[in-house]
């Protein structure tokens, strides 16, 4: 939660800032702090199992995306009763919240591209949710991986795609 608190510190003082433990990042257990390559090298079976079923895969000593969705249920109910809100949290959590409000299958949430340094404005309406994205144009390394792909920052061997 350290990174999200650091991001939110720039919000004006009149914003009512709340910290909800339920919005913590997906707990990656023994893999916390490791890159995808380090996980692949140290825990090859776990890396393969996660690639096979990222939604249900639970890190050793950690959580799965399914666990995060269950953890977020009470928060989402609260969000639905709220007026305008701004959520500053981590990508996995944002993917789950985004999937809910965009009426997407939660089992596909791990592969949704929620870019870093982007404000995603969701406006619920009678016929669906309107989405507008505002990019901050801050340099960042994307670790997003589509299902069955390598992260954008990883360089596959020549001729391999």
Feature-to-residue mapping (PLM):
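Eukaryotic N-terminal low-complexity, Ser/Thr- and Lys/Arg-rich leader segments
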Residues: 127-161
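Short glycine/proline- and acidic residue-enriched helix-loop micro-motifs
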Residues: 46-66, 146-148
């Amino acid at each position: 939660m350290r990174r999200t608190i650091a991001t939110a510190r720039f919000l004006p003082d009149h914003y009512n800032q709340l910290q909800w433990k339920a919005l913590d990042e997906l707990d990656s257990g023994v893999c916390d702090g490791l890159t995808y390559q380090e996980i692949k090298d140290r825990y090859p079976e776990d890396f393969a199992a996660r690639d096979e079923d990222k939604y249900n895969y639970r890190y050793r000593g950690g959580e799965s995306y399914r666990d995060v969705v269950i953890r977020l249920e009470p928060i989402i109910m609260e969000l639905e009763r709220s007026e305008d809100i701004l959520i500053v949290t981590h990508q996995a959590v944002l993917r789950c919240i985004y999937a809910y409000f965009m009426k997407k299958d939660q089992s596909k949430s791990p592969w949704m591209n929620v870019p870093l340094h982007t404000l995603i404005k969701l406006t619920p309406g009678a016929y669906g949710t309107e989405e507008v994205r505002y990019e901050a144009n801050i340099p960042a390394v994307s670790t997003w991986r589509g299902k069955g792909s390598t992260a954008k920052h990883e360089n596959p061997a020549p001729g391999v795609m």
